[in-house]
């Protein structure tokens, strides 16, 4: 453009001609003038051309505006015509039309009936007229010629009466509508018919009498003739004849009177017949009026039909016109939109041209000014050039510099135009950014509202939890009050202790004597001096002389002999504690003696041994046992109270033991158990070792804090089957129940039944295991906790045994590589119990102490896993508590499965050897996905801990980072599939299970029947697989891509909705909620294009503008944020660029573990870094959940039953 406006001045036509030696400047000045004139002419022509184009564009704009105005007028007129032509109530008109059709049909039926009745009446009337005309004379002459009437006259009267009767009956049926007016006439007609019938009968009778009288009169006349002809007859005969004749005359006169009466009645009948004929005429008149009405109704019917046809034709015409008008309206709309677009474009072009025109005018002015200056300078230089040729050379240089400057000026102007265009683009982008900011603010407002709602809900739930905790605190307060009362009773029982010690020593001597007698009577056991054969410590009571069991104790050599020979060696423990231990053993024997009667009947094998032992025992031994039980019965209450209070006396020693245990760690707990049984630390007859014996009631079990997870599970009624290593029973009134949950397996029920009667058929390995676990040296005398567990059961519940005790001990046969483990768990529990009591007293039952206790327990669990990891033990060598902690923390199994596994699985070898059917039968896991979860977790931890297995890169799955709570609460909502959360949480689906879910599992167990949702789910799994199941990497990438378009692969459903809002499709954005649309679907599914997205957004096909915007922005999104690209041939199909693996290269285990160290337990994944115990609860809180609502939801989801 600038080249046309400002042509460059050629250098060949300048002053070099003057430098050729001619010496005159006159030829160069006209050339410069001509160039300037050409420049001005070209500028003027350009201006004229621009003005012409401006005028043309203005004219076209005016024309288009006029057309648009006309189109608007035409549209308004058509709309008005449409409104006037179409009825307002079309549905009402159709209903009325249907009603009119029904009425017309009814009228046609009535018309047909009236026509038929009219024909019938016409025929009947014609027949009546014929009869009347035929029999008129006979009716008139009936009375006159009654005597000589022939039988034909009767038939004519009968026919007339029949015709009238049929006529009246027909009119009865005809006149239904005028029945009220004709009711009186019909009644009268019926009366007349009856009278007519009666008269007809009387006439018949009179005819017969008349015939008889005729015969009599004929005979009388004959007699008169004879009398006249024979007058010489006697006077007697004449007198007789005269008498009979008088009688006949009287009869004739009577008959004449009767005939006169009948004639009068006949005249009355004629009058009535005349009235009936008048009535018939009236009916005919009514029939004529009905015919006229019928004709009118037919005419109206035809008119209505004609109107209906016209209305239907008008309706069809109007529909056709409406369709044409709609088409024209749509075309006009399209034309109007196109005209608006063209108008906007033309206005923009006009504004640009105006600005360009102003710029050119300014440039022209500047050029003119420069030109004038140049002319002045040129004149001066020409004047000087006449005398100074050097000045001409300088002028030539200046002219060349001026031309270069003009060229540079043209380049600068072009650059200015480019900068202006870029500025306009930036302004548009700024407007879009402001719109996005507004949308983001609206979205933030919605999010704040939802967060407020969630916070209110969480506040309500926390209030409920607070109420429950306050109730638990009240229970603790009541327990403390009971403890204070027990202390008072302890002071009272201190006085009686000396007498009780003396009595117990005497009873012990008698018991030793009875045991020696029982051993001498037994012949089936060859090893009397060897280790006693027992499995459960409660079975000690079966070895006295009254017992029916075949298990007999050896003579008590260890402690008793040492006590008699050298008391100083054995009395290293506290004298009082030792005496209490002896009391406990004696009382356990007596309690078992009382329980043996009920326990005899369980099991056939046990019954054989019991019967054989009865034959060996003497009746005197039974009597001695009975007397011994009667003697001790009175003292059991006081001894029971004293032993319960011994727990409180041991608080200080147990606190010291807990401190030692926490310093030494879990690796040296076995030695600590032995140290406690041999050193100066006294044993724990009631609380510390109670969990290693089967408790008869809850009195012997240590109390735990009520904030523990198993206690919450017990309160929810999910599973109260808690094994001894994790007993959390509140008070001595609480027993271990299974009312609210089924047993863990059928095998557990069978073992519970065997526990009552088959306590004696165990092996020497079990005896060694129990001795090691309780930390004893010399046998049953030194095991005080085994006797204490059944004391209170004599009064409270002598026959009640927990399912957990039977399962835990009979499964304990498999636990051979763990001596002292039960003692370790018991000591740990005792320490926890007493520490809990002391902390409650110090802090006043505050929540801080409960939280610290909970954190300490969690830290101890993590220390177990850290110890196993530090030692490098394979999973098969893990012990029972470590396996249970692994299930609870890393696998994320619910509390009821953890409890069942704690009761049934005692080592990692047992857990790894379980098959699918054994998992279902032994642990009670019936859900196939639950079994899949457990099997995959076992395979993963075995490969992770096996020294021969290759290192895996997916270590994050093994440590519970992406458990089922993360899947249900975070991952599924990020995919836009939160509607399946409850099914996934119920099936405990975690990240390691995602690659193993089949279509059958998705459709059946997880209820994901929509194929599009399954495709979206698979794309989400592919995204996790590409990120190597690294949760931290996923969260980091999502955080980075929150405000800019990149890494669409990791976009969540919310991020896609925000992108939809940012491109200006706000009204359709909410349609993507719960639709399954997320970034991985956009980036990985080749078949998912903008049309599928528009279908999910529910954008109508008529809205071409929104669809065009979506197509443009969708393509830009794929280009900028994904690896999908347009092919050169077809813009609609995409291809995948092979650069994804470069972005996500596989990381080594060390780097991955170091990057995800925050989600792992401390001192486990990375051995070089250690975290303090105080930081551990925070890390676990970060692992478990992200928000307060998710933390609250997890507690409710765990109550599913399998």
Curated annotation (Swiss-Prot):
Keyword Cell cycle attributed: no
GO biological process assignments: cell-matrix adhesion; cortical microtubule organization; negative regulation of protein localization to plasma membrane; negative regulation of stress fiber assembly; regulation of postsynaptic membrane neurotransmitter receptor levels; signal transduction; synapse organization
InterPro entries: Liprin (IPR029515), Liprin-alpha_SAM_rpt_1 (IPR037620), Liprin-alpha_SAM_rpt_2 (IPR037621), Liprin-alpha_SAM_rpt_3 (IPR037622), SAM (IPR001660), SAM/pointed_sf (IPR013761)
Ranges of compositional bias, category Polar residues: 832-841, 1184-1202
A Pfam family assignment: SAM_1
PROSITE patterns: SAM_DOMAIN
Gene Ontology terms: cellular component: axon; cell cortex; cytoplasm; cytosol; focal adhesion; presynaptic active zone; protein-containing complex; Schaffer collateral - CA1 synapse
Assembly notes: Homodimer. Interacts with PTPRF (via D2 domain). Part of a cortical microtubule stabilization complex (CMSC) composed of KANK1, PPFIA1, PPFIBP1, ERC1/ELKS, PHLDB2/LL5beta, CLASPs, KIF21A and possibly additional interactors; within CMSCs KANK1 and PHLDB2/LL5beta seem to be the core components for recruiting microtubule-binding proteins KIF21A and CLASPs, whereas PPFIA1, PPFIBP1 and ERC1/ELKS serve as scaffolds for protein clustering.
Full protein name: Liprin-alpha-1
Organism of derivation: Homo sapiens
Organism placement in taxonomy: Eukaryota, Metazoa, Chordata, Craniata, Vertebrata
